């Protein structure tokens, strides 16, 4: 039987055809979160060691923070305020030795220590976002897994389907930083040699040098709740950049039935990200189109948006037009975007084996 790859979007469409609406949910599968008729917003995100976080360079406290940021960002991407977090935690039978890079000798963590570190990280983000851990479940299994369910509330939700022809496309913050930081940390963890030189010929330690902003954006993304209050009345279509600019902008085009044209020269890229790409001989534009997990807000509006709101950069990066598909304008040429971002199923075939 031939191997047929199945995308995450393809699997979602299959699930949508299987499950039936019974009128209890205002908006179900297909957006950043589900929406009930009373304005309650619900999302859930699963995270697995090795796939979504790497214990070779992260502490469990950092894992908890990062997972909480990712899940809460989906609530913010519905223009809602987070309220409660439920944590389902699968702990490995064996003791963990996370993040040997942050200490000279790896420290074996008991189950109690694992729980303390993970939950302290999650609760730290909850404190910043004004929500709280309200329960969950804990089991013991072979690998470390977390699933976070977050609820929130909104009177004026925003959807991926809200973009309109004539709108302008905006994004908060910077693009590509988190993925660049992940690669920097992964390379450093693989080297395991203090002061080893990387591909750029400079000292490998990411601490205290130009890579630090990238590392920080990977380890500690920030859900953009702080600016949502001011942005909400201005927004038409909304999504967060969890899967990468190309994938998430394409979601806006498909759900809204519009054409989006990105302006290549307008994309906000940190100098450190540009330097990271230059060191590797890669094109910064191609990199940021596919780089995910920045958790910035990607939105459309017909109103002018200030370039800075509550200390967060907001950049005009494109336009919404009549038509279909995602396009990019670069050097006097407009072409379709073929790059894609993160897909959970990209290495899985239809029979469950790795392609």
Segment roles from a protein language model:
Residues 22-23, 30-31, 37-39, 80-83, ...:
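Short coil/turn connectors at secondary-structure junctions
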Residues 35, 71, 79, 133, ...:
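Residue-level signal for inorganic ion chemistry
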Residues 27-28, 41-44, 132-136, 150, ...:
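General beta-strand structural signal in soluble alpha/beta enzymes
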Residues 1-76, 337-340:
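N-terminal glycine-rich phosphate/pyrophosphate-binding loops that anchor nucleotide-derived ligands
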């Amino acid at each position: 039987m031939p191997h047929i790859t199945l995308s995450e979007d393809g699997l979602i469409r299959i699930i949508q055809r299987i499950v039936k609406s019974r009128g209890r949910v205002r908006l179900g599968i297909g957006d950043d979160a589900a929406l009930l008729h009373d304005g309650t917003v619900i999302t859930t995100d699963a995270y697995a060691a090795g796939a979504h976080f790497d214990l070779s360079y992260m502490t469990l406290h950092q894992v908890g923070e990062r997972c909480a940021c990712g899940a809460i960002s989906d609530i913010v991407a519905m223009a809602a305020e987070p309220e409660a977090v439920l944590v389902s935690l699968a702990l490995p039978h064996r003791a963990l030795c996370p993040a040997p890079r942050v200490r000279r000798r790896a420290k074996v963590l008991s189950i109690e220590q694992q729980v303390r570190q993970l939950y302290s990280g999650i609760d730290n983000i909850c404190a910043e976002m004004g929500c709280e851990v309200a329960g969950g479940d804990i089991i013991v299994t072979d690998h470390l897994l977390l699933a976070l369910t977050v609820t929130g509330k909104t009177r004026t939700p925003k959807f991926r389907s809200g973009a309109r022809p004539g709108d302008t496309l905006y994004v908060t913050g910077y693009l590509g930083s988190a993925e660049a930081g992940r690669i920097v940390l992964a390379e450093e963890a693989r080297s395991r040699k203090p002061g080893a030189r990387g591909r750029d010929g400079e000292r490998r330690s990411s601490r205290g040098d130009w890579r630090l902003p990238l590392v920080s954006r990977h380890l500690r993304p920030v859900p953009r709740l702080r600016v949502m209050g001011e942005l909400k009345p201005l927004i038409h279509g909304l999504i967060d950049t969890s899967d990468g600019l190309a994938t998430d902008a394409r979601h806006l085009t498909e759900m809204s039935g519009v054409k989006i044209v990105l302006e290549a020269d307008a994309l906000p890229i940190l100098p450190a990200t540009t330097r990271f790409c230059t060191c590797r001989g890669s094109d910064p534009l191609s990199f940021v189109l596919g780089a995910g997990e920045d958790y910035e807000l990607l939105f459309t509006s017909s109103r002018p948006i200030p370039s800075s709101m509550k200390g967060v950069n907001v950049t005009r990066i494109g336009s919404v037009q009549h038509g279909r598909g995602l396009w990019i304008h670069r050097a006097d040429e407009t072409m379709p975007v073929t790059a894609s971002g993160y897909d959970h199923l990209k290495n899985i075939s239809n029979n469950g084996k790795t392609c």
